[in-house]
A protein has these predicted regions:
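Bacterial N-terminal signal peptides
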Residues: 3-19
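Boundary at the C-terminal end of the N-terminal hydrophobic targeting segment
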Residues: 20-25
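Aromatic (tryptophan-biased) beta-strands that constitute blades/sheets of beta-rich domains
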Residues: 27-74, 110-124, 164-186
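Hydrophobic/aromatic beta-strand positions that recur at structurally equivalent sites within the blades
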Residues: 53-56, 104, 158
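Structural core of flavin- and non-heme-iron oxidoreductases
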Residues: 102-106, 115-118, 137-138
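Short loop/turn segments that connect beta-strands within beta-propeller blades
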Residues: 105-108, 160-162
Length: 187
């Protein structure tokens, strides 16, 4: 019967599927020390295979640079709760109550670019100024993209290399200062 042939074909096909092995699960972690997610990787393992720092040399570490994030926005924000993302050789973080995004050179602490959302009445009235303290990273069509949800309920997509709003993402926001692309109004 036709049903028997379909079932037999399915049985012949299933063994050819690639099934994740236990070894693959143990390969989780961050490639080349990158920390592309809040918890290091998509599984939130908080594990890095890097071994330059260990219990024997930890006490020998010295501060390489200092980056101040308390002066981003209309008033100082002394409670910086952001987990930086490390991808494509850059650190990405947010600072200030407006959640300004900065890309930093991890070797020097130099600011490579910064993105600030235009000031809006929605931000002024937001009860979320102390929440939403991070960014997300993804590769889209071969390039890095930084995503940010702000206290004013806008979702921004930024080119990870330049910090410019992502072309073709979102729709124009009818408020002063917003680019024609790169933003989604979440309200």
């Amino acid at each position: 019967s036709l049903m028997s042939l379909l079932f037999a074909g399915l049985l012949a096909f299933v063994p050819s599927l690639s099934v994740p092995s236990a070894a693959n699960a143990q390969d989780r972690g961050t490639p080349f020390g990158e920390w592309r997610y809040w918890g290091a990787d998509a599984w939130s393992t908080r594990y890095s295979p890097l071994d330059q720092i260990d219990a024997e040399n930890f006490d020998d570490l010295e501060q390489a640079w200092l980056w101040r994030g308390d002066n981003f926005g209309p008033s100082p924000d002394y409670i910086l709760r952001s987990t930086p993302i490390y991808a494509d050789g850059r650190l990405f973080t947010v600072a200030g109550q407006s959640r300004a995004v900065s890309a930093l050179d991890p070797a020097t602490g130099e600011v490579l670019w910064m993105f600030r959302e235009p000031h809006t009445t929605r931000w002024e009235r937001s009860s979320r100024k102390s929440h939403g303290k991070g960014v997300a990273y993804a590769e889209v069509d071969g390039r890095g993209v930084i995503y940010l949800v702000t206290p004013a309920f806008f979702l921004h997509a930024l080119d990870a290399e330049t910090g410019l709003p992502l072309e073709g993402f979102g729709a124009p926001v009818p408020l002063d200062g917003f680019d024609e692309t790169g933003t989604v109004d979440l309200l």
